[in-house]
C-alpha cells in the first residue's frame, strides 16, 4: 500500500532533528525550473499570485533567492520533519525509529507544488508554492499543467516497487488533482473522516487533516499492507462506518464527546 499526503504551509527548521538520515528528491530539475520562474517576481507580484501578506511575500521571495539546485543537510531537512501542519501533527514522525522510517520511505509519498512528489526523508528547502497556484508556465496555465503526468508516472513506479497496486489517498482535493487517476496503475482508496458537531456529522477541516496524518502513522506503525486492515482504524476515537462506505471510499466517524 502506498499513501499520499498533502504538504503543509507551516514549516519547522528550528527543532532538533531526530534522524541523520536523508534522501534526495527525484525531481529537482523540475523544481529548479519553477524556482527560476518564481525568481522573476517582485514581492508584490508574489503577494497577488499567492494571496499572501506583504511580510509573507517578502519571506518567500527571499526563500526563492536562497534555494539551491543541490539540497544538503546544511540547507534542507527531511520533508517529513520540515512540514509542520495538522497532518504532520497526526503523523508525529519525530518518534519514528529506523524501522518505521524504512516503512515510511517505501509506503508514503508527499505531493508538492514545487517538488512534485517527495519521499519522507527527501531533503526539503524552505518554500511556499501551493499546488492550486495559477502560475502560468511554458507547459500551461497552472501547476497541474506543469506537472502533467510526471507525478503519476513516479507514483506508478513507487507502486511497483512496494509490491501492490493500492494507493491510499490521504491528500486534499487540491493536491490529489495533480494525480491522473486514469493513468494510475492502481486502485485508489479514499478515507473520509467526519466529526459530530451539534448532533450532525460533517468533515471539519482541522480534525480531518489531523486524522489523515493519524492514518498514515497507523499505516507505518502497524505495518498495514491490506485494505481490509484499514477498517480496524480506531485511533483518536474514530470508527469505521460500513453502512456509509463503499469499496474505495472508507467513512470513519467520531462522536463529539471523543473529539475533545
UniProtKB/Swiss-Prot annotation:
This protein's GO CC annotations:
cytosol
Q: Which top-rank group of organisms is this from?
A: Bacteria
* GO terms for biological process, alphabetical: response to hydroperoxide
InterPro entries reported for this sequence: YaaA
Q: Which family does it belong to?
A: Belongs to the UPF0246 family.
Q: Which NCBIfam families match?
A: PRK02101.1-1 (NF002541), PRK02101.1-3 (NF002542)
HAMAP family xrefs: UPF0246
The protein in question is named UPF0246 protein Tola_0968
Amino acid at each position: 500500500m502506498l499513501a499520499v499526503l498533502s504538504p503543509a504551509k507551516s514549516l519547522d527548521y528550528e527543532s532538533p532533528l531526530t534522524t541523520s538520515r536523508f534522501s534526495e528528491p527525484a525531481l529537482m530539475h523540475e523544481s529548479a525550473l519553477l524556482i527560476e520562474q518564481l525568481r522573476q517576481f517582485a514581492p508584490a507580484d508574489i503577494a497577488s499570485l499567492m494571496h499572501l501578506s506583504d511580510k509573507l511575500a517578502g519571506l518567500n521571495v527571499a526563500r526563492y533567492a536562497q534555494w539551491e539546485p543541490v539540497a544538503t543537510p546544511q540547507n534542507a531537512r527531511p520533508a517529513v520533519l520540515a512540514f509542520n501542519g495538522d497532518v504532520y501533527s497526526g503523523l508525529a514522525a519525530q518518534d519514528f525509529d529506523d524501522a518505521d522510517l524504512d516503512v515510511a520511505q517505501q509506503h508514503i509519498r508527499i505531493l508538492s507544488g514545487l517538488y512534485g512528489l517527495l519521499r519522507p526523508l527527501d531533503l526539503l528547502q524552505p518554500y511556499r508554492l501551493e499546488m492550486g497556484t495559477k502560475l502560468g508556465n511554458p507547459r500551461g496555465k497552472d501547476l497541474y499543467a506543469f506537472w502533467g503526468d510526471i507525478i503519476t508516472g513516479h507514483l506508478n513506479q513507487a507502486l511497483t516497487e512496494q509490491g501492490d497496486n493500492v494507493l491510499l489517498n490521504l491528500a486534499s482535493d487540491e493536491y490529489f488533482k495533480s494525480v491522473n487517476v486514469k493513468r494510475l496503475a492502481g486502485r485508489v482508496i479514499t478515507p473520509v473522516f467526519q466529526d459530530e458537531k451539534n448532533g450532525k456529522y460533517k468533515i471539519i477541516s482541522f480534525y480531518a487533516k489531523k486524522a489523515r496524518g493519524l492514518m498514515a502513522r497507523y499505516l507505518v506503525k502497524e505495518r498495514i499492507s491490506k485494505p481490509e486492515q484499514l477498517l480496524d482504524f480506531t485511533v483518536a476515537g474514530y470508527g469505521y462506518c460500513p453502512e456509509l462506505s463503499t469499496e474505495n471510499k472508507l467513512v470513519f466517524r467520531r462522536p463529539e464527546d471523543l473529539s475533545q
